[in-house]
Amino acid sequence: MHRAMKLGTLREVLGCLLQRGLIDVGMIGGAQSDRYANINSTLIGRPNAIRRRLPGSGGANDMASHCPRLIVITHHERRRFPERCDYITSPGFLDGPGGRERAGLRKEFTVTVITDLAVMENDPETCALRILKVMPGVTIDAVRAETGFRPEVAPGVTEVDPPAPEDLRVLRDELDPARVYLKEEETLPTSRR
């Protein structure tokens, strides 16, 4: 809240701003994301056979339900991209075209999933995630090998432009000097490329 007179509570942000439609973009993470960009951050397994409990929504459901644009950031591993999430914490397109409308959620909705292998976005017609860009040195086959469903490929897939040296300096020296999120040099094992 730039130049805010007061710092809002989570309740004020979610209830007064988000649910009134005053926030355009939400950013979330999760343990699983499926073909239709549904996000699971609640449990691994089935409700009657839970293998692992996770933190839960923490406001992510509100963002996925009310923001017209959602950005999901996660590592790209096959177990994180199943055909269907074990549990839907935050709705993407639920069961495909028309799923959001049937559930009473906003129709105008776009999801972008950014991983260490690719950038995926929902196809406007099928609502399924499709590969939009790949990270430098990563192939479409490598992305598909680490995905539990077969994502389509958008026309004209290109590599993500590497960050400029000044952008890296700002990220590493000003935003994350303790290297909580960024490592000095992040590289992928060659088996994942």
Q: Where is each model-derived feature located?
A:
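Conserved phosphate- and dinucleotide-binding cores of soluble alpha/beta proteins
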Residues: 1-159, 163
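A conserved C-terminal secondary-structure "cap"
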Residues: 155-193
